Amino acid sequence: MAQNFTKLNPQFENIIFEHDDNQMILNFGPQHPSSHGQLRLILELEGEKIIKATPEIGYLHRGCEKLGENMTYNEYMPTTDRLDYTSSTSNNYAYAYAVETLLNLEIPRRAQVIRTILLELNRMISHIFFISVHALDVGAMSVFLYAFKTREYGLDLMEDYCGARLTHNAIRIGGVPLDLPPNWLEGLKKFLGEMRECKKLIQGLLDKNRIWRMRLENVGVVTPKMAQSWGMSGIMLRGTGIAYDIRKEEPYELYKELDFDVPVGNYGDSYDRYCLYMLEIDESIRIIEQLIPMYAKTDTPIMAQNPHYISAPKEDIMTQNYALMQHFVLVAQGMRPPVGEVYAPTESPKGELGFFIHSEGEPYPHRLKIRAPSFYHIGALSDILVGQYLADAVTVIGSTNAVFGEVDR
């Protein structure tokens, strides 16, 4: 008996060619080593030029927002590590900041100092990681090796503080879990010196490298209008000349007390963005050097004092009956924030990372929404890549510094 087989034709989004002479459809990813995660791009080519780019995401979707709606507020904290996993502490802090805003908590000053140090340390680790991988994409392997060596020292500091090198879980709602270990600040000072030396070395290898500049200059140009229409933030926005940094515009923690600049670009191309990452490393070093002397002038508490939402110190839990009962209720049932909603933006290494939380007074959020910068930057590829050569697609994708843990969520 003859079998009827239905021939399946590939379907692409609105791909119609008037002339087939010099045109081609190319699938880029989702397993391509330069796609920086699970990115699939459907590229329409005319010769070597891209005439249309259609990003397809979702290959790393894990339902992170829905998970948050089915966990207590404290239970969800480790899950935030898995968003932008190259700077986990930034995710931890953004979530904690949103919950603290909802609870109207006052954070002890020592915890604020430690948090700001950790945020800027993570910013440097994330930036040096981007520069090394971006250079490797373009073909500069030596930079990758030197930068990763220095990054390891930063990861050692994070491991000394919280016990983890990648998924840190280093922030708590109401403060931080630990005080700084002995001699940790001395190790931090040494790391700052090593980071300066590494930055000089990288600049020596790249800034006057003719091939590097030819591959990046006038490639992946983003205009101010394009950046605003796509909702870009961070260096993708500042590279166009718009000086918008949430640490300056809506300061949190100790940023309003710190002296630092917001570098901006002139041309909005990939080379401008590389330069801004290098300049922001300098600003992070400058911020940490202001924070180190502040630490010694702070009192010892590292967690907020509020029995409705925050457990008492461990010594009180072990010696006082009421503190033990309060701790048991918070762990077993979870805190119950007031009814309301809040959106708290922060300046992560990638751009504006914010958490929206709608509370109905239950131990878990009624709605949790994550505003991740990489999601918007990947969407903008459909504009940025048009007119670029296929050989430059890897450079453009890399210069967005997107991490797919926070794109797909």
From Swiss-Prot:
Q: Which InterPro entries match?
A: NADH_Q_OxRdtase_suD (IPR001135), NDH1_su_D/H (IPR022885), NiFe-Hase_large (IPR029014)
Q: How does it sit in the membrane?
A: Peripheral membrane protein
- According to its UniProt record, where is this protein located? Cell inner membrane
Q: Which GO terms describe its molecular function?
A: NAD binding; NADH:ubiquinone reductase (non-electrogenic) activity; quinone binding
Subunit structure of this chain's protein: NDH-1 is composed of 14 different subunits. Subunits NuoB, C, D, E, F, and G constitute the peripheral sector of the complex.
- Which keywords does the record carry? Cell inner membrane, Cell membrane, Membrane, NAD, Quinone, Translocase, Transport, Ubiquinone
**What is the catalytic activity of this protein?**
a quinone + NADH + 5 H(+)(in) = a quinol + NAD(+) + 4 H(+)(out)
| Gene it is expressed from | nuoD
Q: Superkingdom, according to UniProt?
A: Bacteria
Top EC class for this record: translocase
GO cellular component entries: plasma membrane
Q: Would the keyword Translocase be found if you checked this record's keyword annotation?
A: yes
Q: What is its EC number?
A: 7.1.1.-
Q: Which Gene3D superfamilies match?
A: Cytochrome-c3 Hydrogenase, chain B
* Full protein name: NADH-quinone oxidoreductase subunit D
Function according to Swiss-Prot or TrEMBL:
NDH-1 shuttles electrons from NADH, via FMN and iron-sulfur (Fe-S) centers, to quinones in the respiratory chain. The immediate electron acceptor for the enzyme in this species is believed to be ubiquinone. Couples the redox reaction to proton translocation (for every two electrons transferred, four hydrogen ions are translocated across the cytoplasmic membrane), and thus conserves the redox energy in a proton gradient.
Family membership noted in the UniProt record = Belongs to the complex I 49 kDa subunit family.
